[in-house]
């Protein structure tokens, strides 16, 4: 059983998939940091000093009544919130990651090139008696007049 597991793991597809998952996770972390730490702060500054991660909607106030200055304050007093700013950050991260994967797949596809079309089926055959070329559907050779098998 250990030998079978070793063969399974050492197969090319499994190792490639493992590397892809590890690199994908690291790439996801980079994109998340890009969105939350690089893209969103300047965008919030342009809009008026807004931190998108602090966009939330209070469904139920916590032990201290609102309004709360930040999402962390609302969570600290146990308020129930819908955190749509964090969702917005995640949505932008997803869009960037999806676009990057699309561009990667598109470039890989263009490097491979188009597959060659299969060769067309022959429209002619050779007469077994006189070796002349005859149509594929012929039942009699026009050169030697031999009866052909179908």
Swiss-Prot record:
InterPro entries: MS_channel, MSC/AndL, MscL_channel. Keywords: Cell inner membrane, Cell membrane, Ion channel, Ion transport, Membrane, Transmembrane, Transmembrane helix, Transport. The keyword Heme does not apply. It is a multi-pass membrane protein. One of its GO terms (molecular function) is mechanosensitive monoatomic ion channel activity. Its main location: membrane. Coiled coil: none annotated. Disulfide bonds: none annotated. The chain crosses the membrane at residues 19-39, 85-105. Signal peptide: none annotated. It is found in: Cell inner membrane. GO terms for cellular component: plasma membrane. Channel that opens in response to stretch forces in the membrane lipid bilayer. May participate in the regulation of osmotic pressure changes within the cell. HAMAP family: MscL. Belongs to the MscL family. Homopentamer. This is Large-conductance mechanosensitive channel. It comes from Chlorobium limicola (strain DSM 245 / NBRC 103803 / 6330). The lineage of its organism: Bacteria, Pseudomonadati, Chlorobiota, Chlorobiia, Chlorobiales.
């Amino acid at each position: 059983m250990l030998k079978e597991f070793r063969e399974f793991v050492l197969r090319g597809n499994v190792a490639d998939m493992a590397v892809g998952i590890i690199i994908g996770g690291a790439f996801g972390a980079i994109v998340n940091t890009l969105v939350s730490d690089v893209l969103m702060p300047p965008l919030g500054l342009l809009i008026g000093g807004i931190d998108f991660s602090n966009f939330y909607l209070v469904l139920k106030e916590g032990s201290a009544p609102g309004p709360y200055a930040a999402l962390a304050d609302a969570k600290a007093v146990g308020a129930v919130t819908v955190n749509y700013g964090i969702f917005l950050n995640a949505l932008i991260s997803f869009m960037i990651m999806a676009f990057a994967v699309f561009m990667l797949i598109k470039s890989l596809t263009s490097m491979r090139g188009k597959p060659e079309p299969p060769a067309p089926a022959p429209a002619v055959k050779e007469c077994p008696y006189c070796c002349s070329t005859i149509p594929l559907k012929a039942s009699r050779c026009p050169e030697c007049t031999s009866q052909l098998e179908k």
